[in-house]
Swiss-Prot record:
HAMAP family the record matches: SmrB (MF_01042)
Domain Smr: 93-168
Upper lineage: Bacteria, Pseudomonadati, Pseudomonadota, Gammaproteobacteria, Alteromonadales
Gene Ontology annotations of biological process type: rescue of stalled ribosome
Gene Ontology MF: a single term: RNA endonuclease activity
Name by which UniProt lists this protein: Ribosome rescue factor SmrB
Species for this entry: Shewanella sp. (strain MR-4)
Length: 176
């Protein structure tokens, strides 16, 4: 094709559609598409994560020794059981490579999954070193109402790069 054919074709097309007006759409009303189950669950997780976890809250946590915390009203024997590895985590969460905002959502989803699946213990792997997640994860866990206790994990579950978390699943028989 050359330029003369293009110009001629455009002129013919323009002549054909010269008096045509667009039709106004007044008969069909299109509904907004329904949200998928995944989108709804993600929105709920974000809502829960934002309502439970604050980055400005600074709880009193141990500076030296293993990272540990016990909620008020929980028997101190539970913390000892976590330390010894008596509880086997049913769910594991590896936060390596996550940003802080993503890790917060994943942590909220893990706790929600534990409650839903009646899992009393889970393991959160935040990594070695002095990274931001290693500092933030314990602070977030302290703020969640379903967390009864946490302790630095035994060697077989990650040692000082992980935390074993005890979740309050209600009046269910305790599993170890």
């Amino acid at each position: 094709m050359n330029k003369d054919d293009d110009k001629e074709g455009m002129a013919m097309f323009s002549a054909l559609i010269e008096g045509i007006k667009p039709i106004a759409q007044d008969k069909r009303h299109f509904r907004t598409p329904l949200k998928t189950k995944q989108e709804i669950e993600l929105k709920e997780q974000q809502l829960h994560a934002n309502s439970y976890f604050s980055d400005t809250y600074q709880p009193l946590l141990p500076v030296q020794g293993p990272m540990r915390w016990l909620d008020e009203g929980v028997d101190s024997l539970e913390l000892k059981r976590l330390r010894r590895g008596d509880y086997q985590p049913d769910l594991l969460l590896d936060l390596h490579g996550y940003r802080q905002s993503e890790a917060k959502l994943e942590l909220a989803a893990l706790i929600q999954a534990c409650v839903k699946q009646q899992s009393q213990c889970c393991c959160v792997m935040h990594g070695y070193g002095t990274g931001i997640l290693k500092q933030q994860v314990p602070m977030w866990l302290v703020q969640h109402p379903m967390v009864k206790a946490f302790h630095q994990a035994p060697k077989e579950w990650g040692g000082d790069a992980a935390l074993l978390v005890l979740i309050d699943i209600g009046d269910q028989p305790h599993r170890r």
